[in-house]
Each structure stands twice: as C-alpha cells, then as structure tokens.
C-alpha cells in the first residue's frame, strides 16, 4: 500500500479515467480499487490541509459508517494523503474490488423485465434514507448491483466522499 503513490501511474488496470482516476490493482491475494483524486487547486489545498477532511479521508470514514449502518460498500482498506510544502497535494482511497455492475442499465427507461430489480432498488433507496444515509452523488454509476443464487438483489454504494448522515429528527 505504501508503494501506491510511487507506482500508481505504471501499475494496475484503469477502471475509470476522468476527473479522478480509478485503477484495479492486485495486492497479494486480493484485488483493490485505488482512486486517485485530482490534485486540488490552491484554495482547496489549504482547506483540505487545515479545515476539512480530504476526499480520500471522507471516503474511508463514510465507507465505515455505511457498513456500521448495515449497508454494503466495498471494504475500505486505506487512504493515503501526500503533502508538499505543508499542503495536501495528492490523496488516494483504497478499497477491495467489488465485481458488481452499476445500475445504469436500470435507468434506461425499460421497466418491462426489470420489475424485480427496480422494486429491490426502490426498497434499498428507501432503507438508506430511513437510516439517515444521504448519498449526495446518488447516480447510476455509484450504485453496484448483485444477484445471488436465489435471484435476490443487493446493492453496494461507491464514490461516497460526498455523503451526509442525518439524525433521526432530520429523516
């Protein structure tokens, strides 16, 4: 894990390359996903260094919170922050690889044939909100779906650095 900042560019398979870069990397006997967050601009470098948790740290903490509430998210492994001249320069979030597919296919407008999946997704979404978990980037690419041998569906949240935990009063 300590080698990730030095070897990130050369190792692993790119899963996503946009504002941030996600790579699947083998670490011993497990595969992990490493999310390299874009280098923040100077104002956010100051903010993340002194006033607010970095996106990597929030991802790690929120993943544990989600699990404590009884919901799935890929198992958090670590987060890494690098500082240059006392300011955050790069950060990485590492979690176990989850082979689930995103729910994008459910959002294509086709209800017929997807009734069971859509019902399960609606129940899952309601349960998240009842538990006070508000994912502020609840887009189809950030929700993974799994189907077990009994044809039951479960879901897993990813990209959780923008999340809010509500109190019972707020729910």
Task: Label the model's feature ranges.
Residues 2-102, 120-131:
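Conserved ATP-binding subdomain of kinase catalytic cores across diverse folds
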Residues 42, 82-85, 103, 144-149, ...:
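Active-site-proximal flexible loops/turns
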Residues 51-54, 113, 170-171:
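Short alpha-helix boundary/capping segments
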Residues 103-112:
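AlphaC helix of the protein kinase catalytic domain
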Residues 114-118:
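Short alpha-helical scaffold element within the canonical Hanks-type protein kinase domain
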Residues 134:
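Conserved catalytic-core element of eukaryotic-like protein kinases
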Residues 137, 141-171:
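Catalytic activation segment of kinase domains across protein kinase-like and atypical kinase folds
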């Amino acid at each position: 894990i300590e080698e990730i900042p030095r070897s990130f560019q050369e190792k692993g398979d790119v899963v996503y390359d946009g504002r941030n870069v996600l790579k699947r990397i083998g670490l011993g006997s497990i595969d992990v996903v490493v999310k390299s967050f874009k280098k923040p601009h100077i104002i956010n470098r100051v903010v993340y260094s002194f006033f607010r948790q970095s996106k990597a740290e929030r991802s790690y903490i929120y993943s544990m919170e989600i699990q404590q509430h009884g919901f799935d998210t890929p198992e958090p492994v670590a987060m890494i922050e690098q500082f240059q001249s006392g300011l955050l320069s790069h950060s990485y979030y590492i979690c176990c690889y989850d082979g689930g597919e995103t729910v994008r296919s459910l959002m294509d407008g086709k209800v017929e044939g997807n009734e069971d999946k859509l019902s399960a997704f609606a129940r899952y979404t309601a349960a998240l909100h009842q538990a006070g978990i508000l994912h502020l980037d609840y887009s189809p690419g950030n929700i993974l779906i799994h189907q077990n041998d009994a044809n039951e569906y479960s879901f897993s949240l990813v990209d959780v650095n923008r999340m809010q935990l509500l109190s019972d009063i707020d729910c």
